[in-house]
Regions:
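Negatively charged, low-complexity tracts enriched in Asp/Glu with abundant Ser/Thr
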Residues: 1-42, 72-73
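Short, intrinsically disordered, low-complexity terminal/loop segments
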Residues: 2-3, 97-99
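Glycine-rich loop at the start of a catalytic domain that most often binds anionic cofactors/ligands
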Residues: 43-48
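Intrinsically disordered, low-complexity regulatory segments enriched in Ser/Thr/Pro
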Residues: 50-76
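Ampiphathic alpha-helical segments that act as solvent-exposed interaction surfaces
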Residues: 71-98
């Protein structure tokens, strides 16, 4: 892969992760965009012990958000649904908070 293709792919990831970050923030979560490689570090400010890192990958059917353990979250076409799923995972993982 050439430098231009790699740069374009990183720009695409950053763009989609930025859209997801905005959706997460409207749901009361904190999302920090990391650039190398592009990922989102997501935390619930009420339970800082619980966090998740999400990245963005190109698959045969398009671009998708992906949990750190490799499961696909949702298509990048639907960042709102992805944010809902991520919030559900974070909130239900918290030892001190009800969903």
């Amino acid at each position: 892969m050439g430098v231009m293709a790699a740069t374009s792919r990183e720009h695409t990831r950053t763009y989609f992760l930025g859209k997801l970050a905005r959706e997460l923030e409207t749901r009361g979560l904190e999302a920090v965009l990391r650039t190398d490689p592009p990922t989102l570090r997501i935390t619930d400010p009420d339970t800082a012990m619980v966090s998740e890192t999400v990245d963005c990958v190109a698959l045969a059917d398009g671009w998708f958000y992906r949990f750190s353990w490799g499961d696909v979250v949702e298509s990048t076409d639907n960042p709102a649904a992805a944010a809902d799923r991520i919030r559900h995972v974070l909130v239900t993982s918290s030892p001190n908070r009800d969903a």
